[in-house]
A protein has these predicted regions:
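Short, Lys/Arg-rich, polar N-terminal cytosolic tail immediately upstream
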Residues: 1-8, 144-146
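Juxtamembrane helix-break-helix junctions at the cytosolic face
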Residues: 72-87, 107
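Non-cytosolic membrane-interface motifs at loop->transmembrane helix junctions
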Residues: 87, 91, 111-122
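Membrane-helix boundary connector in multi-pass membrane proteins
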Residues: 101-118, 135-136
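Membrane-water interface at the C-terminal end of transmembrane alpha helices
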Residues: 124-147
Length: 147
């Protein structure tokens, strides 16, 4: 995929990611226990009976919400000119890789909590998606607008 088709695909992907990050961020801050319980229920349905621990540490909730706001913002800025803001996709991939690997470490070292495994898989996939979009943005075939 090259040219205008690649650009349209990258823009669409970034817009969808921005919306999903915003929705998840709002859910994190509005109903953190509900998110954990729902995902734990799915884990139990799949055979993992270790429930996600609840937290009363509001600082971590605030930081998780802030992270979701930042990555949604990265997607919104990058989609405005995917050639010019292409490097932001590497920042997004780095953040998602850190989240994915951190979750894997908690899953392996702490407890086999389903949400840790799920976050490893989801954020790992999102990191790969960000790298793929970065690659596609490099195939658009026009110079970056100096702005």
């Amino acid at each position: 995929m090259r040219g205008a088709k690649a650009e349209a695909f990258v823009v669409l992907g970034l817009r969808l990611m921005a919306v999903s990050f915003a929705v998840v961020g709002i859910l994190f801050i509005a109903v953190p226990s509900g998110v954990l319980d729902t995902i734990s229920d799915v884990g139990e349905w799949l055979g993992n009976d270790t429930r996600a621990p609840h937290t009363q540490e509001d600082l971590w909730l605030a930081l998780a919400f802030a992270y979701m706001v930042v990555i949604a913002g990265i997607c919104l800025v990058a989609q405005m000119d995917v050639v010019r803001y292409r490097p932001l996709l590497l920042v997004l991939a780095a953040g998602k890789t850190a989240s994915s690997l951190g979750s894997l470490a908690f899953f392996l070292i702490d407890e086999h909590v389903f949400i840790y495994l799920l976050n490893f898989l989801v954020d790992g996939t999102l990191a790969l998606l960000a790298l793929w979009l970065w690659s596609l943005a490099g195939r658009i075939g026009r110079p970056a607008d100096p702005g």
